[in-house]
Amino acid sequence: YQGSYVGFHTILLSTIVLVLPIGAYMLLHADSYAALLPQVLLFLVFSVGIFFPLLKVIWIASLLNQNSMGIAEVDAILFEKELAEPTNPKRPTEATISFENVTFAYEEKEVLKEISFTAAPGTITALVGSSGAGKSTIAMLTARFWDIENGNIKIGGIPLKEIATADLMNQIAFVFQDNPLFFDTIEENIRMGNKTATAEQVEAAARAAQCHDFIMALPEGYQTKICDGGVYLSGGEQQRISIARAILKDAPILILDEASAYADAENEHEMQIALRSLIQHKTVIMIAHRLTTIRNANQILVVDQGQIKEKGSHNELLEKHGLYADMWSTEEYSSSWTICAGKEAVTE
């Protein structure tokens, strides 16, 4: 719609350029110059006067087009078929995650094939692999964002389809690469993890997530509003708010999807402390592109083209000299790259 708006805007701006040469030509070939001149002047004035009314009409038309696209997206969500709720729901008593020969496809495109692994409470299971390999899909299926075609996914020995959605969501906390924050206060954004939490509990979660100090430096502390008339937070600060939210929820299962993506030299240490506070005694599924962040995971699953190609600890996978070893070597090599300026080189 923006392209059409710009095109019509350009055409309207060009009307006087089109009228002038035509009017000049008509005046040169007119039998009566005096009789034709008022008509030419009228068209010149008309071409300028009609510009702004037509521009408003085109602008409104473009907004209507934009609104119709937004309505279509909202309708797609509202009319999305809900997942079936179990008739006799069961509630897990522990947080072991089991994938048993899971196959899944987006419409007709198969993205996971015969995935099997077990993640026990108090352990970290890391998923690594190239973009599009299926890592995030595995994490999302753990929360039953979609139903699978074949196989079974269980939490505490209970298939996901037999767990009520509300109970399942209470079992899982998420920290994503891009963390949604709402146009509300910092305190309410953290309290999204536990709507009944007190102000003291919110502050304790913020301290554990290493974000209390930067929150107190904001104009109104925990009552500072985010965005829309308030402040804007950096990517690293948003992630630590999301970690505080997950700490406050205290769910037994934790899914981390590139949770340290925005960590830099200044806040990486704080981010690691926050994550250590978050993952204690939980079943953790962690997706990472930087292998240094998951080298201490209890098990690492190397996902490639929708399949688990390798499985083991960091040292075990290095000894296999397979995909993981190649990825580790590539990361180590890239960390030694230098930026050259003339005859000087600066090591990264």
Label for each model-derived stretch:
Residues L12-V19, Q66, T198, P252, ...:
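Residue-level signal for transmembrane alpha-helical positions in Major Facilitator Superfamily
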Residues P92-E348:
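ABC-type nucleotide-binding domain
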Residues L44, F51, M169:
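Conserved catalytic core of two-component sensor histidine kinases
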Residues T87-P89:
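Short beta-strand segments of immunoglobulin-like
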Residues G3-F8, G49-I77:
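Cytosolic ends of transmembrane helices, especially the final helix of ABC transmembrane type-1 domains
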Residues V17-A24, L54, N67, I71, ...:
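Alpha-helical transmembrane segments of polytopic integral membrane proteins
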Residues Y1-L44:
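A hydrophobic transmembrane-helix motif
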